[in-house]
UniProtKB/Swiss-Prot annotation:
Bifunctional enzyme which can phosphorylate or dephosphorylate isocitrate dehydrogenase (IDH) on a specific serine residue. This is a regulatory mechanism which enables bacteria to bypass the Krebs cycle via the glyoxylate shunt in response to the source of carbon. When bacteria are grown on glucose, IDH is fully active and unphosphorylated, but when grown on acetate or ethanol, the activity of IDH declines drastically concomitant with its phosphorylation. It comes from Rhodopseudomonas palustris (strain ATCC BAA-98 / CGA009). Keywords: ATP-binding, Cytoplasm, Glyoxylate bypass, Hydrolase, Kinase, Nucleotide-binding, Protein phosphatase, Serine/threonine-protein kinase, Transferase, Tricarboxylic acid cycle. GO terms for biological process: glucose metabolic process; glyoxylate cycle; tricarboxylic acid cycle. This is Isocitrate dehydrogenase kinase/phosphatase. Coiled coil: none annotated. It is found in: Cytoplasm. ATP binds at A359, P360, G361, F362, K363, G364, T365, K380. It comes from the Bacteria.
Amino acid sequence: MTATASHTRARPLGASEIEHATRIAEPDFDLLDALYRTDDPDDQARLLARVVLSAFDNYYAVSRRIPALAQAAFEARDWPVTVRLSKIRIGLYTACIDQLVPLLKAGLPELTTDEQLWPTAEAELLAAIEGRYEADFAFAFWQSLRRKLVSDEWRPVSYDAGSTARRTTSPAAVLKTTATTLPITAEVIAGILDEAGFRVPWRDRDGDAALAAQAIETALEPLSPRPGEPVKIEIADSGFLRNRGACLVGRIKLRDRGDMPMRNLPLLIALLNEKDGLVVDAVLTDSDELQYAFSSTLANYHATNPRYHELARLLYELMPKRPLGTQYSCIGFHHLGKVAVMSEILAEHRKTKEKLATAPGFKGTVAIAFTMPSSAYVLKIIRDHPTDDYKFDYFDGLDEVLRKYNLVHEIDRAGSMLDNIIYSNVKLDRAMFAPELLDELLEAGIGTVTLDRGALVFRHLIVQIKLTPLPLYLANASAAESRAAVINLGDCIKNNAAADIFNKDLDGRNYGVSRIRKVYLFDYDAVEPLTSVTVSRDGAAPGEFDNGMVFRPQEMLEGLRIDDPGLRRAFRDAHPELMQADYWEGMQQALRDGKVPKVMNYPASRRLRR
């Protein structure tokens, strides 16, 4: 964040400015030439390590510039640029590797088969990155490039060599502390807002600070606060920016009082940049609400502080229901999150000795989903061919379905679609699998799964956060919980539409409910761009679709299979526009015009001005 705030509207970023700032530098051709020319194995190892590290440094420099650009776009209210920056960032890692791989293959083809060179070169790389903060990230980059060249199996390798082995990270290094006494005043909150340093005038800073202080005071009441009691407000020295919004994140700490233990309250101050100035839109003080705001179902945050380990640890402490690996992913460090998630899955198995078995719910027609009972994750493969219950006349095939899962990973998921981690060439011990699942994987996933002695090798493996399928949830939930879920289902469908995503298989079985009782779409084999769908105003013909691409809004409830009349009525009353063609055509036009629709990332009840 910047140190001071000015009172002039920020300048929009130009297209050439963004292109220049996010352009990946070319590989070091002098180093490449030296690598190609030498026949000495030690020189080859040393030069290969230098070439790859140079490429990583190019990537990392650009990736660290993007959060500052995102802040500038937020300050200028340049919403299309914020979306563009998110897309650039998420594709940057792969683009940088893809830039280098063909050069190495062409100039040193033996890299794909030389089993002696890689260990020696890896030792050179580890020595070169010793002591660097981002050493683990550089090593992840090395592993990614090696797999591209060698087509080796994916392993959750983390950087832990020598004296730079990372100990348990504390978030203290990224926290700024304000010490005061209860009650927390508007002046204290105003000071925290000023320290954020946005280069945008506030619409009503003092009024917002007063409302925020009041919201915090209400949230503290269950902790039995006393007037004059010492309190610390810890705020991350980082802006978190995403699309139209920004937020300040931290916690409020009340120390041990004798009759009360240490008490912590999560804190998120959500900011919007409106036409007439910066405003505090909401204050969140509940861990589950923070989890929704930082959900992997949303686009990733740009964090302006580069200390990603401390930020991920802070987020985990604030949202302990959410695995640590996904905390890395939600601030854009997918490849570190990828390592952390697989490490967590393997650790879960070692700890519980549970078997991977078919996931609860209805049998997937396109995917086979499996999990361990106490795991936080669900794993999936795509079938070679859909089951007989498949609804559509034509199946696009494995590669096209994987493309759709990748598409969802790369877009703003608008708070209503699970992110996916897609692994290639993963080997898992055969003993991890229940016999029935093992048989199904080998029979229905011949193009994806092979048996290699005592292990299963997955050509592709999709991992998602575990949800309860919506029909199962409704079968066991109370009337109030069920009503809230179907209303949230409508919000989910609207948010998907705002992200230009339409699920042509509008079946409740493709949606699930999270631990924090939010509804998400989690199956993507039937997703299409909303802008490519024909919305029909003619309800005469039966069925939802003609040729798979004509949508009749008036038939939505039949497609969702909500059988309970009361729940159908609740859905219809809460979201009547979803059954109207005007809504869908209006959303399509907004998307074609390049507008960025607003998406609600937190409960409306937490907004300061409703």
